[in-house]
């Protein structure tokens, strides 16, 4: 299935149902009291995280989602039926933004997580609500409010502990094949990897971590060169970045300059991503003599001003890979991810005293003093026997 990590949809919640103006009519009771019911609330639009999905391709074709409208109130104090909610399933790891304001509405980071993106309209009030000792036959009602309509931007961001960085053909896909059961395509030409891929590294029966491989970066990626930087967002959730440097580039380019290109593109993309822990990993050591590989790695680290530990590996032969993975596992255990705050329960709204209805009542009361026939204009009265 094609990997699609961005989509824009329109979420329209249902409108609230209108209140009803009705009067009770029974045998020997020609002038019964009001019995108009309230309308029903409009349906909401929800997002549901599903771990069985891994792409947003479905929303490239189906873009409009509309919840059901609440039914109007009826006589005999019958409240209208609430509109049905609509549930949109998205992959775990989806970030939800409001296209109009660019506000982050939420992150779908765990299976079965729910997020309301459009609230249904409030129900209108029937004339029963307006009866009083001085107004025994009210012909007033309120209409339901409109449901929210939002254009939502969905961005799928892979959930991984470790992210791979490097130029094309630095050996990122070979590394993932060496440490996990993932089998990304490997070839001797640039941009073999066209979409992100994930691999699970199992250290023992109880410990494991997830590695994300993204297409390689080149100079000018921030300006759209190559595959651009659109896949860098998949590394924002990672705890540590592994920066792979080819010790013996086929094109005889300078490894120091290659490393600086990656750092520059990271900084141009996001300060947050550039500030993440980054480990230097020199790959393809098997193409050189052990002494030459060690001296070349040491020289590159000095020129880069790298004072921390670096790693010398051969992903193809799996030399030094196991030790690197154990160090990564130890780092992840020592720096656990922050737990997301528990979701607050939606606040219950008492619709009788909602601002919308209160404003409507105040407006109608003001009109009473100007119009002696306020109860005869535009009112549909239902008489029931």
Swiss-Prot record:
InterPro entries, A to Z: G_OBG, GTP-bd, GTP-bd_Obg/CgtA, GTP1-OBG_CS, GTP1_OBG_dom, GTP1_OBG_dom_sf, OBG_GTPase, P-loop_NTPase
GO molecular function, one term: GTP binding
All residue ranges annotated as the Obg domain in the record: 1-159
Domain OBG-type G: start-end pairs: 160-333
Localization per Swiss-Prot or TrEMBL: Cytoplasm
GO terms of biological process kind: ribosome biogenesis
EC number: 3.6.5.-
Region named Disordered: 362-385
Residues reported to bind GTP: 166-173, 191-195, 213-216, 283-286, 314-316
Main location: cytoplasm
UniProt cofactor(s): Mg(2+)
PROSITE patterns with a match to the protein in the record: G_OBG, GTP1_OBG, OBG
UniProt keyword annotations, A-Z: Cytoplasm, GTP-binding, Hydrolase, Magnesium, Metal-binding, Nucleotide-binding
Pfam families xref list: GTP1_OBG, MMR_HSR1
Bias type Acidic residues, positions: 362-379
Keyword Transcription listed: no
Positions bound to Mg(2+): 173, 193
Subunit structure, interactors included: Monomer.
Stated role: An essential GTPase which binds GTP, GDP and possibly (p)ppGpp with moderate affinity, with high nucleotide exchange rates and a fairly low GTP hydrolysis rate. Plays a role in control of the cell cycle, stress response, ribosome biogenesis and in those bacteria that undergo differentiation, in morphogenesis control.
Protein family membership: Belongs to the TRAFAC class OBG-HflX-like GTPase superfamily. OBG GTPase family.
The protein's name in its UniProt record: GTPase Obg
Organism: Sodalis glossinidius (strain morsitans)
């Amino acid at each position: 299935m094609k990997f699609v990590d961005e989509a824009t949809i329109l979420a329209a919640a249902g409108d609230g149902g209108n209140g009803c103006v009705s009067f009770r009519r029974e045998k020997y009771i020609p002038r019964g009291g009001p019995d108009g019911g309230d309308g029903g609330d409009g349906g909401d639009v929800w997002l549901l995280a599903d771990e069985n999905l891994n792409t947003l391709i479905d929303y490239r074709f189906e873009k409009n989602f509309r919840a059901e409208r609440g039914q109007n109130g009826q006589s005999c104090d019958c409240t209208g039926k609430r509109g049905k909610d609509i549930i949109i399933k998205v992959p775990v790891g989806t970030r939800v933004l409001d296209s109009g304001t660019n506000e982050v509405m939420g992150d779908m980071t765990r299976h079965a997580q729910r997020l309301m993106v459009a609230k249904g309209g409030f129900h209108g009030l029937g004339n029963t609500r307006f009866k009083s000792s001085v107004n025994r036959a009210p012909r007033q009602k309120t209409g339901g409010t409109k449901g929210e309509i939002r254009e939502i931007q969905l961005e799928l961001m892979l959930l991984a502990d470790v992210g791979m960085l490097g130029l094309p053909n630095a050996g990122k896909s070979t590394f993932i094949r060496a440490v996990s059961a993932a089998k990304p395509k490997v070839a001797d030409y640039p941009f073999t990897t066209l979409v992100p891929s994930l691999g699970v590294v199992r250290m023992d029966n109880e410990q494991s971590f997830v590695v994300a491989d993204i297409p390689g970066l080149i100079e000018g990626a921030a300006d759209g060169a190559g595959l651009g930087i659109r896949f860098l967002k998949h590394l924002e959730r990672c705890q540590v970045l592994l920066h792979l440097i080819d010790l013996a580039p086929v094109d005889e380019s300078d490894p120091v300059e290659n490393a600086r290109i990656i750092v520059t593109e990271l900084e141009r993309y996001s300060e947050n991503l550039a500030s993440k822990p980054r480990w230097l990993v020199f790959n393809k050591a098997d193409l050189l003599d052990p002494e030459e590989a060690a001296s070349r790695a040491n020289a590159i680290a000095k020129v880069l001003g790298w004072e921390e530990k670096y790693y010398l590996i051969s992903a193809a032969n799996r030399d030094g890979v196991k030790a690197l993975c154990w160090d990564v596992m130890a780092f992840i255990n020592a720096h656990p991810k922050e737990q997301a705050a528990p979701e607050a329960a939606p606040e219950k709204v008492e619709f009788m005293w909602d601002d919308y209805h209160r404003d409507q009542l105040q407006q109608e009361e003001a009109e009473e003093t100007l119009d002696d026939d306020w109860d005869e204009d535009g009112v549909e009265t239902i008489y029931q026997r």
